[in-house]
Regions:
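Soluble, non-transmembrane catalytic domains of enzymes that act on hydrophobic metabolites at membranes
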Residues: 1-25, 90, 106-110, 114, ...
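Terminal amphipathic alpha-helical/low-complexity segments used for targeting or macromolecular assembly
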Residues: 1-71, 75, 186-194
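Arginine residue identity/basic-tract feature
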Residues: 29, 48, 52, 65, ...
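Residues at secondary-structure transition points
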Residues: 40, 58, 62, 80, ...
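Left-handed beta-helix
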Residues: 75, 81, 86-87, 92-101, ...
Length: 194
């Protein structure tokens, strides 16, 4: 599912992440404000650096983890350098977001604060979710285990998702239940829309 984005230059990736925040946050007034004052953007930028280090050499894994932990201390957002995150990821507000080592996230995904893409076991190997393209994950949602979230999915605020969610579905509740998406508007939390 995850496409390699190594063909993009590092700075092109950073620019795309910046533009994703500007495009997806109605409160964003300009790129300078976003570049200086958005912890979600800072965390994604630090991840991009750490991920390159993680994949470059075993000798760079420890420095990548250290930078990742410093970023967590500054932003409140924890992204493991081994995770695979697609282009134009937007983490809005961000405090309390956790993305585990084997998580895979597609392109044009929006993640709100308090979200966990976590594991449900301590075993080696794939233990975190795979998230498709154009997915919106509401505030406080927990997406747990080696499950697959399809493209164009909306996950409601505080949902606990422990089973696959097919494309073009909404997942809400504890445990989350899937239903067809009624609201096709981007960035509307399905937990509060009709």
């Amino acid at each position: 599912m995850q496409k390699k984005i190594e063909h993009l230059t590092f700075f092109k990736q950073l620019k795309e992440d910046l533009q994703a925040a500007v495009d997806n946050d109605p409160a964003a007034r300009n790129t300078l404000e976003v570049a200086l004052a958005y912890p979600g953007v800072h965390a994604v930028w630090a991840y991009r650096l750490c991920h390159r280090m993680w994949n470059k050499s075993p000798l760079l894994k420890l420095p990548a983890r250290i930078i990742s932990q410093l970023t967590r201390a500054i932003t409140g957002i924890e992204i493991h350098p081994g995770a695979q995150l697609g282009r134009r990821l937007f983490i809005d507000h961000g405090m309390g977001v956790v993305i585990g080592e084997t998580a895979e996230v597609g392109e044009d995904v929006t993640i709100f604060h308090g979200t966990t893409l976590g594991g449900i076991s301590m075993r080696k190997g794939k233990r975190h979710p795979t998230v498709g393209n154009r997915v919106i994950i509401g505030a406080g949602a927990k997406v747990l285990g080696p499950i697959t979230i399809g493209d164009d999915v909306q996950i409601g605020a505080n949902a606990v998702v422990v089973k696959d969610v097919p494309s073009c579905q909404v997942a809400v509740g504890i445990p989350a239940r899937n239903r067809p998406a009624k609201n096709k508007q981007p960035h509307i939390d399905p937990a509060v829309s009709d």
